[in-house]
Amino acid sequence: MKRNQRKQLIGTVVSTKNAKTATVKVTSRFKHPLYHKSVIRHKKYHVHNFGELVANDGDRVQIIETRPLSALKRWRIVKIIERAK
């Protein structure tokens, strides 16, 4: 996959209990095609949380798709948008 075609998402760190791994919850909003109601969906991603950018619970982060790092991890943190209070 070319570097400029990698998917980027913004989400909130839910868990940092695993070593070098954070769980990020990404929320997406769309309009239902038949009922025209606004629907909210959530998805959790296992993200590489190691090195210079170490996120904590509650942080808002930007993640990017990368090569498989383990059985579940295919994302890494690009930047921390907002720290938890």
From Swiss-Prot:
Q: Does the keyword Flavoprotein apply?
A: no
Keyword rRNA-binding part of the UniProt annotation: yes
Cystine pairs: none
Q: Which GO terms describe its cellular component?
A: cytosolic small ribosomal subunit
One record GO biological process? translation
The protein's matches in Pfam families, at most eight in alphabetical order, are given as:
Ribosomal_S17 (PF00366)
What superkingdom heads the lineage? Bacteria
What is a single molecular function from GO for this protein? rRNA binding
Q: Which UniProt keywords apply?
A: Ribonucleoprotein, Ribosomal protein, RNA-binding, rRNA-binding
Q: What does this protein do?
A: One of the primary rRNA binding proteins, it binds specifically to the 5'-end of 16S ribosomal RNA.
Per the record, the similarity remark reads: Belongs to the universal ribosomal protein uS17 family.
What is its quaternary makeup?
Part of the 30S ribosomal subunit.
Name of this protein: Small ribosomal subunit protein uS17
Q: Which organism is it from?
A: Mycoplasma genitalium (strain ATCC 33530 / DSM 19775 / NCTC 10195 / G37)
UniProt lists the gene as rpsQ
